[in-house]
Amino acid sequence: MKLYVFLVNTGTTLTFDTELTVQTVADLKHAIQSKYKIAIQHQVLVVNGGECMAADRRVCTYSAGTDTNPIFLFNKEMILCDRAPAIPKATFSTENDMEIKVEESLMMPAVFHTVASRTQLAVEMYDVAKKLCSFCEGLVHDEHLQHQGWAAIMANLEDCSNSYQKLLFKFESIYSDYLQSIEDIKLKLTHLGTAVSVMAKIPLLECLTRHSYRECLGRPDSLNEHEGSEKAEMKRSTELVLSPDMPRTTNTSLVTSFHKSMEHVAPDPTGTERGKELRESCQSTVQQEEASVDAKDSDLPFFNVSLLDWINVQDRPNDVESLVRKCFDSMSRLDPKIIQPFMLECHQTIAKLDNQNMKAIKGLEDRLYALDQMIASCSRLVNEQKELAQGFLANQMRAENLKDASVLPDLCLSHANQLMIMLQNHRKLLDIKQKCTTAKQELANNLHVRLKWCCFVMLHADQDGEKLQALLRLVIELLERVRIVEALSTVPQMYCLAVVEVVRRKMFIKHYREWAGALVKDGKQLYEAEKSKRESFGKLFRKSFLRNRLFKGLDSWPSSFCTQKPRKFDCELPDISLKDLQFLQSFCPSEVQPFLRVPLLCDFEPLHQHVLALHNLVKAAQSLDEMSQTITDLLNEQKVSTSQASPQSAASPRIESTTGITTTTSPKTPPPLTVQDTLCPAVCPLEELSPDSIDAHTFDFETISHPNTEQPVHQASIDLDSLAESPESDFMSAVNEFVIEENLSSPNPISDPQSPEMMVESLYSSVINAIDSRRMQDTSTRGNEGFGDRAALHVQLEKCRAAAQDSHSSIQTIKDDLCHFRTFVQKEQCDLANYLKCTAVEIRNIIEKVKCSLEITLKEKHQQELQSLKIEYECKLDALVKDSEENVNKILKLKENLVSLEEALQNKDNEFTSIKHEKDAIVCVQQEKDQKLLEMEKIMHTQHCEIKELKQSREMALEDLKKLHDEKIESLRAEFQCLEQNHLKELEDTLHIRHTQEFEKVMTDHNMSLEKLKKENQQRIDQMLESHASTIQEKEQQLQELKLKVSDLSDMRCKLEVELALKEAETDEIKILLEESRTQQKEMLKSLLEQETENLRTEISKLNQKIHDNNESYQVGLSELRALMTIEKDQCISELISRHEEESNILKAELDNVTSLHRQAYEIEKKLKEQIVELQTRLNSELSALEKQKDEKITQQEEKYEALIQNLEKDKERLVKNHEQDKEHLIQELNFEKNKAVQTALDEFKVERELVEKELLEKVKHLENQIAKTPAFESAREDSSSLVAELQEKLQEEKAKFLEQLEEQEKRKNEEMQNVRTSLIAEQQTNFNTVLTREKMRKENIINDLSDKLKSTMQQQERDKDLIESLSEDRARLLEEKKQLEEEVSKLRTSSFLSSAPVAAAPELYGACAPELPGEPERSVMETADEGRLDSAMETSMMSVQENMLSEEKQRIMLLERTLQLKEEENKRLNQRLMSQSLSSVSSRHSEKIAIRDFQVGDLVLIILDERHDNYVLFTVSPTLYFLHSESLPALDLKPGEGASGASRRPWVLGKVMEKEYCQAKKAQNRFKVPLGTKFYRVKAVSWNKKV
């Protein structure tokens, strides 16, 4: 296992030991520095996902470091270099020598050694292929990792931008709040200045410093025990705070420094007055303080420390002066003049960070996918090399095992073919390697530029982020300091209030402790007395029969209340006395005197009354000791009595006493207690028990518990049961009364008399009444027997009853008060709730009514306005809709024209060279036009100056007239009051009539002008449509002619080999560029059309506004006239007539001047129109000349291309003819040589045969002579017969040998012929390849020229766009000039209107007294009407001029677009011609040529395996697919896709076409793996045999 780090700059993987994963990132950086010499400061380590690795964290905490997910390293030194990092190119030792080795091995003879050397070469080629494939895979893997690294750094950039945006948003929000509160901060600082001056005058009390010093040292407070230590601490505190001589100087220095800091604030244009106020207040405070200090130096005691000195000492060196200085420094740093440009820079950095063109690498994923496909083809080539190498090894093993030399020639020939295939595969692998290396280098170059951008952008963002953080800190610190300032400004008031509060609390504690002591003392006595009484009664009543039956609850105990002293509080208060407060009153300034008032003492009378009441209650409780004495006597009697005495005898007097109770009281309705004589005074109400907001709740009634207490509900009854010694009637009445009270206050009282509980109670009470009545009868019969005992008991009972009545009367009064208050509070609550409900309902009703009324009124107004607006804008909308529809139709037609003419742009190559010269001419024309425009501007400037002078003179005259007029009005105002009303009524009527007439005239004129404009626009649109239709017809005719030419050229199609298919990629790139240019042109057209429509809309809105302004101006004039009529009065007729005549003459002269100015402006407009028309005619003529030149150049280029095409066709025909002639000549030579060789062999064989026959005849003759000579003829005959037989056998053997030799010679000749044929074929192929390469080079040059021309056309298009932009700029200038003229005309119109207003006013004012001058106001009205008509005419003329300009500019743009479209079409056609030329070879089909287009039956085709479709297809350069029929697979010895893998299937085979059928995919899932609806051919073919 290793740790993988990927260097993104160069795309290399760095490996390290896994021990570094346990160590920190800093150790990893040191390891990278030591191993790869990359400095630590230049290293940036990023994990997938964008997280940057921290130096102090361990490497293993990040989920990265594997080979698939490495740590991405960025070298900043490489990024900041100007040159991109170079990718190292790896070359293997044998990859370049393979071709030489193959050529050498092909030259070797057919021997075993050649077989072994070729197998070794094949194995070497396979090894090299494996290395190349692994190298290419590594390169592509590195590119994938580079892509991942770029994605990681982009994620990091995204995180940085998000954090930067959050920081900026936070700062903007805080800074906006700060800007809103600047004035508040300045006000707080001024308050602090006044507070500082006050604090300097307030002396610090000595006891306060002792207290704080004691708190610092942590010593306990002991005010009475440690007086000596307090004195020592006081001395130390005075030494620590300040010496007695220092405070004056420090105070003055502080105030002066505060003043200086106020002066040194950054000057704010809005807050200068506030700064002056601050300075004045500071100076006044300094002067006052110096005077006060000088006056009071003699009166100050020894401990002379002010409150300001103590505050300054608390946090040295941060005193008040430094606090204020820091506040003003930070405010000057946060000046909007400094911050706002910085904020703009921050927003610009955010925009730079969000640059999508730099973030996204367009087309990289498609490129990586293509590289993956290339790697897959590379692996296929390696597998093919492997199979071939294994075949070589197998053939070598067979040859070694057979050891037959006759097999070697065929084996060597097949080896040669296989070596050529391996060499081709090797070349392909080298090509793939080259492509991969170039792709990696290009990606590295691209990433270098983008990483440099990323580095600079992030650096800028970091710098701005640091500034933002510093500014944010500054704002936060400033706001915190302002809070401190706010707190310090309230210190004098708080100091005085705290001193007063301490004095008040001291006074209160004194009285409160006295009252609490007396209360606790009396409470203890009362509680102990009650406790002893209950204990004695409990001992007596414990064994009674009535204990748990009739008298329940007698075992309860009273709760302990006011038996303990309250806890200590306010122990740590400083020792401030009234003397100290008076001292402060005498020395503190007047600003603080309202806060230093002596607190008023509480009203302690209720406390004294409460103490007296408690004393009386204790006396009353102690006065009942006779009852307790009787109880003790009874207890003693029980002890003395005998054991025979029953418990009933002891309880008999109690039972007898109860009879009285039952007779007098009823259980259902107990009567209230009536106390006649009270032994103790009335108890105060509960509100008076506590003084000054200290009520009875200070003591917790429930917390002091008793061991025998029950729940809180029962404790109230227990308190009432404490009166058990009282007579039983009173006791029962009190209990019943309490129960009723509880039932009233309880949430669920039992009030139903028919409920089961009430029925049981009634039954129980009836039974008790019956028993009591029976007892009364018994006692009446026995009354005489115990009369003496009754008398004594009766006396005692009366005493007890009196005491019980006293106690119950006090309780009854308390309960009555409580009940009264409870009912009062409940009534108040109910009344309040009802009142709130009623008021809420009333308010809601009012709000709803107001809402309804407002909604109704608003709806009515809105509907009226909507109706008026609908009526006004319906006609405008109809016109605009018509225009928009016409524009949409035009756009659609333009789009159709664009689509139809897109093919012509590719063929316009040399046209734009002439446009340069034309552009120069246009530039000259533009310069001349600019000069003329400058001259016109100068003239306009001079005229404008003259108009200003005239206006000034007119204004002076008007001011003089107004002064005279005002004087006369003041003198004659009192005389003409009686005539005012009649004259005003008549004038109002006449003015109303005239206004209506003038308004109707203006409206009619406006409608007429609008109708004229509509008619003119419609005529122009019709003319445009007619011209557009004629141009479309002409273009359609041209298109038809061009289509005929294309059809003529498309008939000349021929064949070409497989290698030309690689040029399609270049054409695709050109198509992409063309599509981009088309889209840009479309966008330009859309934008121009939208701009024109918007301009038209704005002009229409301007016209409406002008009409509305005119109406408003007329209305304003009428209102002014009415106001003047109401203010002014009739004056002397004779003087006014004379003055009026003079003023009218002056005004006529001014009006003449204004009309002359109007005429001059109209003449200037005419001149401008003429110049515009001239410029338009010039531009039209120049454009027509440009079009003519373009047409001429197009025809010349077409002629050139036709000539080139003819020359190419002639060259091809010559080549084909020469090739055929060479081939025939070679075949003839081969036949001739073959015949010659056969004849020579036969001749030699005949000669040899004759020689052998001659030799045999001579031998026979010689043998016959020998036989004849010898005597033993018979023996010789036998020998001769044996010799003849032997000779015959020899002859036969020799014949056989000769025949074998002949056969061998024939075989050799045949092999030689085959070798000659193969060599001829190879020569033919090489010649054909050379011709092809030449043709290819020529066509590549043509394509390059075309691409260069296309680039030039694109450049020229850009220049045309610039020209269009310049024309649009000229148009904008003209529009601006027009606007300026309109503004001047409007100014002149307003001035004329203002001048005509007083002229019309004067005669109308005095019309009642001067009937001889009725025509003067009518003249002024007519003049204003004439001026309005002139303005409307001028506006209509300007509108027509503007529309003419817009239409002419539209025509120019349309002409340029059409020329561009024609160029695109011609470019496309020329590209198609070039493609057809490059794909055409020989028109006549030859049997031994491979067809690559337009397959027919009998054509020789190349059948290849297409892995995308998993089928065999015919190799073609056309877009249509030709699939091989599945029935033809066995005939061609091919395997189907289902039965064999891609490695074992043959990659290609040659065949002949037998059948062809046209098909279409009807299912999405099909065996050819094509999309639904795809059209293709299915072809049947047979194997091609060269011999056949």
Curated annotation (Swiss-Prot):
Keyword Cytoplasm (UniProt): yes
Coiled coil: 858-1393, 1440-1479
Span of the annotated motif Nuclear localization signal: 565-568
An example Gene Ontology molecular-function term: protein kinase binding
Xref: InterPro entries: ATG11 (IPR040040), Atg11_C (IPR019460)
Motif (FFAT): 730-736
Record-linked Gene3D superfamilies: Phosphatidylinositol 3-kinase Catalytic Subunit, Chain A, domain 1 (3.10.20.90)
Residues with PTM Phosphoserine: 222, 229, 237, 243, 253, 257, 261, 623, 646, 649, 652, 733, 1087, 1366, 1478
Region (Disordered): 638-674
Post-translational modification: Phosphorylation at Ser-733 of the FFAT motif activates interaction with MOSPD2.
GO biological process: apoptotic process; autophagosome assembly; autophagy; defense response to virus; extrinsic apoptotic signaling pathway; heart development; innate immune response; liver development
Gene Ontology cellular component terms for the protein in this record: Atg1/ULK1 kinase complex; autophagosome membrane; cytoplasm; cytosol; lysosome; nuclear membrane; nucleus; phagophore assembly site
Keyword list, A-Z: Autophagy, Cell cycle, Coiled coil, Cytoplasm, Lysosome, Nucleus, Phosphoprotein, Transcription, Transcription regulation, Tumor suppressor
Positions where Phosphothreonine occurs in the chain: T238
Tissue expression summary: Expressed abundantly in heart and testis, and moderately in kidney, liver and skeletal muscles. Very low expression levels in lung and spleen. Colocalizes with RB1 in various tissues.
Domain remarks: The FFAT motif is involved in the interaction with MOSPD2 and its phosphorylation regulates this interaction.
Subunit structure and binding partners: Part of a complex containing ATG13/KIAA0652, ULK1 and RB1CC1. This complex associates with ATG101. Interacts with PTK2/FAK1 and PTK2B/PYK2. Interacts with GABARAP and GABARAPL1. Interacts with ATG16L1; the interaction is required for ULK1 complex-dependent autophagy. Interacts with RNF111, SKI and SMAD7. Interacts with COP1 in the cytoplasm of proliferating cells in response to UV stimulation. Interacts with TP53. Interacts with C9orf72. Interacts with WDR45B. Interacts with ATG13; this interaction is increased in the absence of TMEM39A. Interacts with WIPI2. Interacts with TAX1BP1.
Function description: Involved in autophagy. Regulates early events but also late events of autophagosome formation through direct interaction with Atg16L1. Required for the formation of the autophagosome-like double-membrane structure that surrounds the Salmonella-containing vacuole (SCV) during S.typhimurium infection and subsequent xenophagy. Involved in repair of DNA damage caused by ionizing radiation, which subsequently improves cell survival by decreasing apoptosis. Inhibits PTK2/FAK1 and PTK2B/PYK2 kinase activity, affecting their downstream signaling pathways.
Name the record gives this protein: RB1-inducible coiled-coil protein 1
Species in which this protein is naturally found: Mus musculus (Mouse)
Taxonomy of the source species: Eukaryota, Metazoa, Chordata, Craniata, Vertebrata
Gene: Rb1cc1
